[in-house]
């Protein structure tokens, strides 16, 4: 399937499985009359494959060691991309950032690293399923930077176009999205 056909098919899957209208309170605290819940798309076999494919293609020219983001939205996405990257002979390892470190066990804030493995000096991409203001992704960026990593890109599947671009620019973070909310609202 061509890139444009993959993108169109994924948009259809998102529209049918993950987009809705109706009043909702977003993670940012804002109210909205539409929403995206990408988990049904990320956990669908075809949706996961297409998200991984298009995300991997968006990262192809970046030199990336790790990909991850804040739990829960980044977990299935980072895992799918890591798997595809292995199959493409260009492995990108995955991790996720806990919203709050576990209070037991190793008490980790960043999960997915092997014993003794570190993000220090590594080039990382932060992924997010849906971005509104950028606040959740910036929390992940802060945790990953604290571990010594370099953030090369913040990549979201759907940008709601409600301030994230400006927030990332202000924070000096490159930002890209696979889709804009307006692509779904104007159809």
Swiss-Prot record:
Binding site residues for 5-phospho-alpha-D-ribose 1-diphosphate: 98-99, 102, 104, 128-136
Coiled coil: none
InterPro entries for the chain: OPRT, Or_phspho_trans_dom, PRibTrfase_dom, PRTase-like
HAMAP family referenced in this protein's UniProt entry, alphabetically: PyrE
Function, in words: Catalyzes the transfer of a ribosyl phosphate group from 5-phosphoribose 1-diphosphate to orotate, leading to the formation of orotidine monophosphate (OMP).
Gene3D superfamilies, sorted: 3.40.50.2020
Cofactor annotation: Mg(2+)
EC number of the protein: 2.4.2.10
Any one GO MF annotation of this record: orotate phosphoribosyltransferase activity
A Gene Ontology BP annotation from the UniProt entry: 'de novo' UMP biosynthetic process
Organism: Rhodopseudomonas palustris (strain BisB5)
Annotated pathway: Pyrimidine metabolism; UMP biosynthesis via de novo pathway; UMP from orotate: step 1/2
Protein name (Swiss-Prot/TrEMBL): Orotate phosphoribosyltransferase
UniProt keyword list: Glycosyltransferase, Magnesium, Pyrimidine biosynthesis, Transferase
Gene: pyrE
Family, similarity comment: Belongs to the purine/pyrimidine phosphoribosyltransferase family. PyrE subfamily.
Binding site for orotate: 132, 160
Catalysed conversion reaction: orotidine 5'-phosphate + diphosphate = orotate + 5-phospho-alpha-D-ribose 1-diphosphate
Top class in the EC scheme: transferase
Subunit structure and binding partners: Homodimer.
